[in-house]
Amino acid sequence: MFSAESSDEMTVRYSPRIARWIAEREDGEYEADGSFVVRHPLADLRWGVRHVLQYGTDAEALSPPELRGAIGEALRHMQAALG
């Protein structure tokens, strides 16, 4: 489905709805809208996809572009499986 190769880091924006919970567990920066941005280590795109998707619409991968593409691909596969 997607390659295991990736960058060493991913940047994820968490929604204001879960920002406080994430901030209690991770180092990052708040944005003006209340969202929270974290740079996570990323050894494998598959892990990154699973990590971001577990938060549904409350998380957005900002980088690397390969991760964003892999998430889109995973979502297309899910949509096709659901008919």
Regions found by a protein language model. Give the residues of each.
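Polybasic (Lys/Arg-rich)
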Residues: 1-83
